[in-house]
C-alpha cells in the first residue's frame, strides 16, 4: 500500500505477520543474524511491521508505507485525521532522514518516530500498544 496525496500505482510492500518464518528459513544463528546488518535490518523492520499490521487488523489504525522518487518512510499510520510517520533503524544512529523530512513537508504528520538507535528502543516499541504512539502520549 502507498499513502500519497494522489492515487498512483505502485508495487505493494511485502510484510510478514510473524518473523519466525524468516528466521527459520535463514538457517542463521542469532549471532550471525546480528552480524549481518542487512539481514538484521530487514528482520527489525519486519518485526515492527508485524506489530503495526496486527494492530490494524484489530481496527486500531490503517498502515501504509510511503515512497516518492528515492525517498521513503517505512510505515505511516492513519487513524481518522491523525498521521504518524515511523522510520525503523537497526544500525547506527542516523542524523539525516530525507524520507521523513519530505513526508513531513507534504503531509504534516502529528508525530514522527524513529524506532532503533537514537529513538525509541525496539523492545519498548514492540511492547507498547500502537494506540500509545498514535495518540501522542510521548513527545
Regions found by a protein language model. Name each.
Residues 1-73, 77-80:
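Accessory nucleic acid-recognition modules appended to NTPase machines
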Residues 15, 84-86, 113-115:
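Hydrophobic/aromatic beta-strand patches that form the interior of the parallel beta-sheet core
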Residues 24, 95, 121-125:
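Switch/connector loops and helix/strand junctions flanking conserved nucleotide-binding motifs
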Residues 55-58, 102-110:
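Arginine/glycine-rich "motif VI" loop of SF2 helicases in the C-terminal RecA-like domain
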Residues 68, 107-126:
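Nucleic-acid nuclease catalytic cores
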Residues 81-92:
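Active-site ExK catalytic segment of metal-dependent nucleases
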Residues 92-100:
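Active-site-adjacent loop/helix micro-motif of nuclease/hydrolase catalytic cores
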Residues 119-139:
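Domain-level recognition of nuclease-like catalytic cores that cleave nucleotide substrates
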Amino acid at each position: 500500500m502507498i499513502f500519497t496525496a494522489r492515487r498512483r500505482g505502485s508495487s505493494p510492500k511485502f510484510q510478514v505477520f510473524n518473523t519466525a518464518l524468516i528466521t527459520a528459513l535463514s538457517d542463521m544463528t542469532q549471532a550471525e543474524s546480528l552480524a549481518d546488518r542487512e539481514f538484521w535490518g530487514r528482520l527489525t523492520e519486519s518485526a515492527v511491521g508485524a506489530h503495526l499490521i496486527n494492530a490494524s487488523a484489530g481496527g486500531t489504525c490503517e498502515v501504509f508505507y510511503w515512497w516518492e522518487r528515492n525517498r521513503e518512510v517505512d510505515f505511516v499510520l492513519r487513524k481518522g485525521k491523525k498521521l504518524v510517520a515511523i522510520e525503523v533503524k537497526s544500525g547506527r544512529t542516523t542524523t539525516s532522514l530525507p524520507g521523513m523530512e519530505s513526508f513531513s513537508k507534504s503531509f504534516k504528520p502529528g508525530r514522527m518516530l524513529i524506532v532503533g538507535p537514537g529513538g525509541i528502543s525496539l523492545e519498548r516499541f514492540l511492547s507498547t500498544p500502537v494506540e500509545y504512539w498514535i495518540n501522542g502520549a510521548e513527545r
